[in-house]
């Protein structure tokens, strides 16, 4: 049996979850399609997903069409959940990208299509909601060519009489994109030689599989119009990326979730081989796991199974496997271009309304962050506040909703702030000597620190001979230095610098690695005080797409948001502005752009890196360490 792992992607409200329900219903996997409006869909399982009609977590379901099994991966549609989408793309054999016939190409559509192109995933466009009033399909095609790709091939005609219908497109002009992309076919066309249809179809299929040509289909997911034709295309056009003739097991974890009873489940894509119940599988050089239970998606449900075949998705209860963990032979994993996840740029304080729920909150955050590595938290041991880093406001709203719905915890959050970093201003050295008050540790440590270029990160070097100071002491110094880099003079992480271990002394037999580990961050802090630090803030590359008449307004508003426009381009009556902007300003800039362009403006961003901060210095409380803070304060008094 052929198995296809299909991603369904779209901007918010394009009808993605409704399409999933319609595919399940039309294929016979379910007796009645669920409704987003009624909250009865199979893939939106969180109440907030049902209430708001948006997908928040990647969901997996499946249907069968003749001898083809299709696993559907229903992905989120909001920008705050891009990390969830990117993880899902790695397991796909193909994708259906929805375009709303009513709303056209949205910002998220462009972002998702860009990711699909980078990973060269074969993609079908499905224009949804064609039965709504006022639809102009030629205008939609034109917008797709201008904003997504000119390499589209419209495979269907949409008729209106006696009622709206979808039929195959037999016009020769539909093949223009195929002919223009192939020199031999173009030469035949220019010389008036006849084509064989098999030649055109073969070239279409080759370019589709390479992710460079995009067939366009039509329908209405809500009314099951055009869905049968879409299923037939999915079953015939997409191929499994599983290597042929390979019996050795290879699988990868792409999703982690917890059940209501707090059981931990991992979702694994099997790339080759077969997984059996009671198999013992190697997951690292030193570690193996035994498969004691597993489920596979089958016809809209999850069923227990004794085997999971190559190409399929399997769900395992497991407390060891992490996101991206490999089961079996890593060499057999397909090579795809890596898409760097966006970094959390915001942080806030989260607290419970009822003090007795604090431990429940901490456990819940541990579980949630386990499935989403971009969500991180720590506890300030002085104030006991819980500090949470995240991507955007919608993500924060979702976290609060999950806490209330799944863990029965009422949480409240403070106004978020941008996550800053620090870099030393100049080179400096500092040494703390053994038996010289107020040093209580049996160790001497001397460090130097100097700034590096932005984006260099932290570089560490030991200039102390191993013959003079053994490896365990040297390792302890490095660990202490890296710990000290977590908090600079203003409480932010230290980066873009070189730190050298210049001098060390120990007394045998009283000195221990702990002495060096605890003293090193104190020495580093004193060196930073001599060097001084500058505050760095995250900057974003941005691309603005807007109708040409809004060019002057976009330029005029840029300085208000500290944005620097570096290039301007006019294309298809649309202006494209590229530049840089502080991350703290982007949300207001986006909102302003949406307002003055009446929703026609699109702003795409990606992290550029950290740059010197503009404006006043923003401090955050230091995270204390009871073992070294007393000594820190003693040195602070001496300064």
UniProtKB/Swiss-Prot annotation:
Cite a single GO BP annotation.
Answer: response to antibiotic
> PROSITE patterns under this entry?
G_TR_1, G_TR_2
Keyword field contains Transcription: no
Keywords, in A-Z order: Antibiotic resistance, GTP-binding, Nucleotide-binding, Protein biosynthesis
Which SMART domains is this protein grouped with?
EFG_C (SM00838), EFG_IV (SM00889)
tr-type G domain: which residues? 1-244
Q: Mind telling me which InterPro entries this protein's record contains?
A: EF-G-like_DII, EFG_II, EFG_III/V, EFG_V-like, G_TR_CS, P-loop_NTPase, Ribosomal_Su5_D2-typ_SF, Ribsml_uS5_D2-typ_fold_subgr
Would I find Cell membrane among this entry's keywords?
no
UniProt binding sites for GTP:
10-17, 74-78, 128-131
Q: Which residues form a coiled coil?
A: none
Stored Pfam families: EF-G_D2 (PF22042), EFG_C (PF00679), EFG_III (PF14492), EFG_IV (PF03764), GTP_EFTU (PF00009)
GO molecular function term, any single one: GTP binding
Record's function text: Abolishes the inhibitory effect of tetracyclin on protein synthesis by a non-covalent modification of the ribosomes.
Family, per entry: Belongs to the TRAFAC class translation factor GTPase superfamily. Classic translation factor GTPase family. TetM/TetO subfamily.
The family database entries (PANTHER family) matched by this protein are listed as:
RIBOSOME-RELEASING FACTOR 2, MITOCHONDRIAL, TRANSLATION ELONGATION FACTOR G-RELATED
Q: What is the protein name stated in its UniProt record?
A: Tetracycline resistance protein TetO
Q: Which organism encodes this protein?
A: Campylobacter coli
